[in-house]
């Protein structure tokens, strides 16, 4: 009889611990999935027509996005966009925002956009926006570096 009670006691402990473990995991997954989408960091153009010339964006926690033209051949960069960034507040996997141009930074940059605002979209790991230069417009696609 003692063996049966001991076996039932052990079984009850195992079931209790297993149930507790599952609840903690579910709670942890829920917490992780509720964190807002994080777009901070460095993003690099993936659809450039050149392997050595492309755009690179830095999204900072101070609420700014800076985009530079990068030219690896002569190791140079030139400002294209400096503007505002509104961080996502939800965990949705798509996001869009309108950035306001920081004209103090862009007005003296030769290759900078003169637009007052620029629309950005994040979807499936890609940030996209339209860029115009020399009368040609292209949708730029960036992926996290």
Regions found by a protein language model. Name each.
Residues 21-23:
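Bacterial signal peptide processing site
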Residues 39, 57-65, 90-91, 120-127, ...:
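Short, solvent-exposed coil/turn segments at beta-strand boundaries
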Residues 6-13:
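Sec-dependent N-terminal signal peptides
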Residues 49-53, 72-126, 133, 138:
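Contiguous, well-ordered beta-strand patches that form the walls/edges
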Residues 29-53, 142:
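Tryptophan-anchored aromatic micro-motifs
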Residues 15-19:
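C-terminal motif of bacterial Sec signal peptides marking the signal peptidase cleavage site
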Residues 42-77:
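Short, structured interface segments that constitute the first stable element of a domain
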Residues 1-4:
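Positively charged n-region of N-terminal signal peptides that target proteins for export
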């Amino acid at each position: 009889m003692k063996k049966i009670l001991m076996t039932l006691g052990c079984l009850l402990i195992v079931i209790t611990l297993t149930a507790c473990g599952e609840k903690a995991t579910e709670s942890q997954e829920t917490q992780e999935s509720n964190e807002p989408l994080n777009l901070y960091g460095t993003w690099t153009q993936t659809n450039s027509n050149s392997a050595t010339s492309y755009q690179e964006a830095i999204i900072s926690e101070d609420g700014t996005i800076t985009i530079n033209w990068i030219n690896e051949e002569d190791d140079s960069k030139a400002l294209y966009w400096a503007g505002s960034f509104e961080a996502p507040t939800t965990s949705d996997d798509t996001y869009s925002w309108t950035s306001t141009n920081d004209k103090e930074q862009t007005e003296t940059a030769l290759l900078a956009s003169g637009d007052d605002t620029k629309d950005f979209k994040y979807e499936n790991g890609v940030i996209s926006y339209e860029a115009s230069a020399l009368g040609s417009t292209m949708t730029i696609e960036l992926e996290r570096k």
